[in-house]
Amino acid sequence: MRGKEVCALVLIWAMLLVLSGCQSQAVQEFPLTKFKAESMLDEGIRQYDNGDYKVAARTIQGSLEAGLTTRSQARAHKYLAFMYCIGGQQNQCRDEFRRTLEIDPKLDLKPEEAGHPIWGPVFKSVKASMPKQ
């Protein structure tokens, strides 16, 4: 090899060595398990949308156990609350909405969710009972 080629290879090697230790913060904070958990949550929501509530509840609970991001944890608890309300389990519905709001106190339901005759009033009641942040 010529001198220039050797210098170029050494420079490339040095750059690769330096860059290998520089992961973005997003990559460092979002390990592979979170991708799996997020995927499980998405699947659980699809199951919910298809009316398969028992399977959806298990999948969404599994996504929580797999390690969702904070924002997705709130979303998961919200969907669990919806399913408990649909199933007539008002206490569990309230508990899930409470967990949702403990994670994300500023969360509001989408207009189409807030207008639901079963869980809309429950969410409103739980939110009103939460300490102001």
Give residue spans per PLM region.
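Bacterial Sec signal peptide processing site at the extreme N-terminus
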Residues: 16-37
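Boundary/linker segments of alpha-helical solenoid repeat arrays
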Residues: 70-73, 103-118
